[in-house]
């Protein structure tokens, strides 16, 4: 078997949601963003001390995760993992005991293949991945008191089905230990970006949606290395339907406090992670963070929104390519509303209480940044600087739950066949067809706000489309030509062109292409979610 190759397909067994962990998004700190492989016992202990002294622990940050390069390059004679004796002379259990003694929890990094990412790229010796050692390593983690496992794919090999089966082996091995361990996976590392292609909640507590983050606002990537904050948001917003207690989209460890962005952008970064129900895993050097960074990371209003017991990710209410409105229902009936300016100039962003799921005529708005309150009859509006985000907690009135983000098959009323990405081809410009419904990932569409996404790509109408233009999938980019409305008559209309999703020529056979056509509400333009 080639190094890094995975075999042995089988369906998932136990649900990750049954492990009792991560009922709200995990909060903590990870060593990688600031230190990479340059880690040791003293650094981790100093960082833990700083988390306590700064008030971060009391704000909810509890997991201290030691990333790649913590291990001895060789397993012991019995095949057990060992901490690197030079870097961690007291051993990994002693480190876990130290963290637990501080009221914190202990996280470690490992991979399901033969080599970690650092080993794959030759920056760290050995081949100490968990491939073939899953049960043994899970028992070792439990014996060391590990509370959080980051499990990074680190291989170009493997189909998405092989990834599911391989990640599930460690999920089940962790469950067999009887110790509640948050299970965090990254299917994207050194691999095609499969993170956004399925709901991984049957496999893990949290899963990465994109390629690795960097401390920049916009790198121009759609899902390639490195990803800026806005780029990650564009991918993660349409995945809202996947989030629930015990299972969360992970847009990556935070870059707040690491430079490369303005204070406004840092605040937006944290605010958007909060409303997206993302794990709040800090990545800065907490030993020397500024007062401004500490203030952002410990904002109690945003943390309360993030940690709300409903565990819902904010869904998109509206987006015009610049001004984005998201709404996150909260357990007590309040709604958190984010007004996010993706443009390069200050602009006013507006919505209404009704649009975000509230009923009534009188509401209180709590500004999550200033803690100021105001009242409104329904209008919610703010002047938002470039790359800024205003967040309000809307209380009062009643709550009408807006249509939740939905994931499922889109079935043509004319044929009973499903909207299908042929051969799971994710190349930009691939034209969907109808095909016998089979439950495949290439027939699962995530519908959130006004976007439709499959296999990590967005349903897209060509610019300046006219009747007969093909529908296609394309990298999600927030463009107006990727916005759709689902209508009461079952049609799906492209908001930019006004044309409807149409099965070409009203044909019903497998492989019939899907195009854009003048809306008629005929059976070949009507779709149901299943």
Model-identified regions with their sequence ranges:
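N-terminal module-boundary/linker segments of secreted carbohydrate-active enzymes
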Residues: 14-45, 50-53, 181, 185, ...
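Glycan-recognition surfaces
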Residues: 133-136, 182-285
């Amino acid at each position: 078997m080639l190094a890094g190759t995975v075999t042995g397909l089988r369906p998932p067994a136990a649900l990750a949601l049954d492990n009792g962990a991560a009922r709200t998004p995990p909060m903590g700190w990870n060593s990688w963003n600031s230190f990479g492989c340059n880690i040791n016992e003293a650094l981790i202990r100093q960082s833990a001390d700083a988390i306590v002294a700064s008030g971060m622990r009391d704000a909810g940050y509890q997991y201290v995760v030691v990333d790649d390069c913590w291990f001895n390059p060789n397993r012991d004679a019995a095949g057990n993992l060992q901490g690197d004796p030079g870097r961690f002379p007291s051993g990994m259990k002693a480190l876990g005991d130290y963290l637990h003694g501080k009221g914190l929890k202990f996280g470690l990094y490992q991979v399901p293949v033969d080599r970690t990412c650092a080993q794959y790229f030759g920056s760290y010796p050995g081949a100490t991945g968990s491939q073939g050692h899953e049960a043994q390593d899970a028992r070792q983690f439990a014996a060391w008191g590990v509370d959080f496992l980051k499990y990074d794919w680190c291989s170009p090999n493997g189909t998405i089905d092989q990834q599911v089966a391989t990640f599930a082996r460690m999920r089940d091995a962790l469950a067999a230990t009887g110790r509640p361990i948050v299970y965090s996976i990254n299917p994207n590392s050194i691999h095609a970006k499969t993170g956004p292609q399925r709901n991984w909640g049957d496999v893990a507590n949290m899963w990465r949606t994109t390629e690795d983050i960097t401390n920049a606002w916009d790198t121009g990537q759609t899902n390639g290395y490195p990803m800026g904050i806005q780029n990650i948001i564009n991918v993660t917003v349409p995945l809202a339907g996947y989030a629930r207690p015990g299972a969360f989209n992970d847009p990556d460890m935070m870059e707040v406090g690491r430079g490369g962005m303005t204070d406004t952008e840092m605040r937006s970064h944290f605010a958007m992670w909060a409303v997206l129900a993302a794990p709040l895993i800090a990545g800065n050097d907490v030993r020397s963070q500024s007062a401004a960074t500490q203030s952002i990371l410990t904002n109690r209003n945003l943390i309360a929104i993030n940690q709300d017991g409903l565990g819902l990710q904010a869904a998109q209410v509206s987006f015009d390519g610049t001004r984005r409105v998201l709404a996150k229902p909260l357990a007590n009936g309040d709604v958190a509303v984010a007004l996010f300016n993706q443009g390069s100039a200050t602009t006013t962003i507006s919505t209404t209480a009704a649009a975000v799921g509230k009923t009534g005529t009188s509401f209180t708005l709590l500004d999550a940044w200033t803690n100021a309150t105001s009242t409104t009859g329904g209008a919610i509006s703010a002047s938002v600087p470039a790359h800024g985000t205003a967040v309000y907690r809307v209380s009062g009135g009643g709550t009408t739950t807006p249509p939740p983000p939905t994931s499922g098959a889109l079935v043509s009323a004319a044929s009973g066949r499903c909207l299908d990405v042929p051969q799971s081809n994710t190349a930009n410009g691939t034209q969907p067809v109808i095909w016998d419904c089979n439950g495949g990932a290439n027939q699962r569409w995530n519908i959130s706000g006004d976007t439709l996404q499959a296999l990590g790509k967005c349903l897209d109408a060509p610019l300046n489309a006219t009747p007969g233009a093909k529908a296609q999938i394309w990298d999600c980019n927030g463009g107006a030509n990727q916005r759709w409305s689902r209508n009461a008559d079952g049609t799906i209309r492209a908001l930019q062109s006004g044309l409807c999703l149409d099965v070409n020529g009203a044909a019903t056979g497998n492989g019939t292409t899907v195009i854009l056509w003048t809306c008629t509400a005929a059976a070949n333009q009507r779709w149901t979610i299943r």
